[in-house]
């Protein structure tokens, strides 16, 4: 039996452009697995918030719809601020700029299959997907201004 393999990275010059929607369609209609670069970071953030006494239900809220809401137990920091500083200021700046790439690329190289990465935000992430034999799809939503670009977040 021949196993087909494909790696697709999604990026957009503007937030809320439909990357998750496209990833959902690829997952639902074509059997892709969604493997985000931020998966390990999200687990770290959830563990940190749990240690502060934030309930799993509230963590789920803060990690999705409530990303910009102050979290009292975290001295008023938002989920987004916590995740961005852990991911960029600590992970990328202190440990290694490629810290979040290995789990995704290793998963793809070991398990293969159809994989979509919907959270490509930096140039090294973009290049890692291409270097692994994948392709990059630019998602553009009419009416959204180009507030950020790959490598600028």
What do the PLM-derived regions correspond to, one by one?
Residues 10-11, 117:
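Hydrophobic anchor at the beta1->P-loop junction of P-loop NTPases
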Residues 15-16:
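Walker A (P-loop) phosphate-binding loop of P-loop NTPases
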Residues 19-20:
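Walker A/P-loop
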Residues 27-35, 53:
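Post-Walker A helix-loop "phosphate-sensing" segment adjacent to the P-loop in P-loop NTPases
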Residues 33, 102-146:
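ATP-dependent NMP and nucleoside kinases share a basic, alpha-helical "lid"
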Residues 39-113:
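ATP-dependent small-molecule kinase phosphotransfer cores
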Residues 147-153:
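Conserved small/polar residues in nucleotide/adenosyl-binding loops
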């Amino acid at each position: 039996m021949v196993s087909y393999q494909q790696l697709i990275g999604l990026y957009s010059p503007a937030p809320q452009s439909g990357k998750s929607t496209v990833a959902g369609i690829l997952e639902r209609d074509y059997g892709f697995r969604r493997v985000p670069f931020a998966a390990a970071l999200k687990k770290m953030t959830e563990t940190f918030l749990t240690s502060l006494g934030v309930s799993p239900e509230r963590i789920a809220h803060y990690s999705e719809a409530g990303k910009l809401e102050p979290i009292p137990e975290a001295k008023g920091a938002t989920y987004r601020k916590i995740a961005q500083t852990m991911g960029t200021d600590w992970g990328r700046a202190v440990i290694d700029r490629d810290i979040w790439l290995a789990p995704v690329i290793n998963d793809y190289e070991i398990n293969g299959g159809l994989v979509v990465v919907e959270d490509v935000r930096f140039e090294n992430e973009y290049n890692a997907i291409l270097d692994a034999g994948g392709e990059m799809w630019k998602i553009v939503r009419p009416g959204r201004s180009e507030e950020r670009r790959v490598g600028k977040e």
